[in-house]
Design a protein with these regions (language model features):
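Membrane-helix interface motif
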Residues: 31-49, 116-133
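Loop-to-transmembrane helix junctions at the membrane interface
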Residues: 82-112
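Cytosolic juxtamembrane helix at the C-terminal end of the final transmembrane segment
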Residues: 2-16, 81-93, 120-127, 159-188
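Canonical alpha-helical transmembrane segments
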Residues: 59-91
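Hydrophobic core of alpha-helical transmembrane segments in multi-pass integral membrane proteins
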Residues: 28-29, 71-80, 108, 165-171
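Hydrophobic alpha-helical membrane-insertion segments
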Residues: 19-36, 101-122
């Protein structure tokens, strides 16, 4: 059975390319907004909570999706589109380059999985501690003062971003271990 890979002249390729452009625009605009808001908070208070503004901002209207959800979604969908349209760039990776890439992807997947589990456990512990103390905490405001107390991370933001990193690196590792396409597949 011959597998048909996407080529530039096919409609499917163009669909993936345009969706990738939309996802890239979403990622860049959300990141720019987050950096701007973080710098504003830093200039006023002298500290900031990484990702807090993205967790507390709902878009396009109240009680809809938060910016972290949009960023997570755009990152995952954008990566999938990139993996579908960018297969030609990986065809010529052989031997030591591919082995090095696979080791880096495996390492990144393990680190991201550890961070997801760690952040999720800390999040659950803080929720449980709040309930034991007699009040349900605002989940969107829970932070961890790691690695620096003056620059804590919002736990929802950290969990979603490291989950996206894990999914992308695990998928890339999976793709890198599949049977290789041949150079003849580049030009149909």
């Amino acid at each position: 059975m011959k597998v048909n890979y996407l080529h530039e002249n096919e409609t499917g390729y163009k669909v993936f390319l345009y969706i990738f452009y939309v996802c890239s625009f979403l990622m860049l605009s959300i990141t720019a907004y987050g950096v701007y808001a973080m710098l504003q908070e830093w200039s006023v208070d002298g500290k900031y909570v990484m990702g807090e503004v993205l967790v507390k901002t709902e878009f396009p209207f109240p009680h809809f999706a938060k910016l972290t959800t949009w960023l997570f979604f755009a990152t995952i969908i954008g990566w999938y589109c990139c993996s579908r349209i960018g297969w030609k760039r990986t065809v010529k990776l052989y031997t030591w380059k591919m082995a090095l890439l696979q080791l880096m992807l495996l390492g990144l997947a393990v680190i991201c999985l550890y961070e997801v589990l760690y952040n999720f456990m800390v999040l659950n512990a803080q929720i449980t501690a709040g309930i034991i103390d007699g009040h349900v905490p605002d989940i969107d405001s829970l932070t961890i003062a790691y690695p620096d107390a003056s620059r804590p991370w919002n736990l929802i933001f950290a969990t979603k971003m490291f989950l996206a990193g894990f999914l992308i690196s695990a998928h890339a590792f999976y793709l890198s271990t599949r049977p290789r396409k041949s150079v003849e597949d580049i030009n149909p």
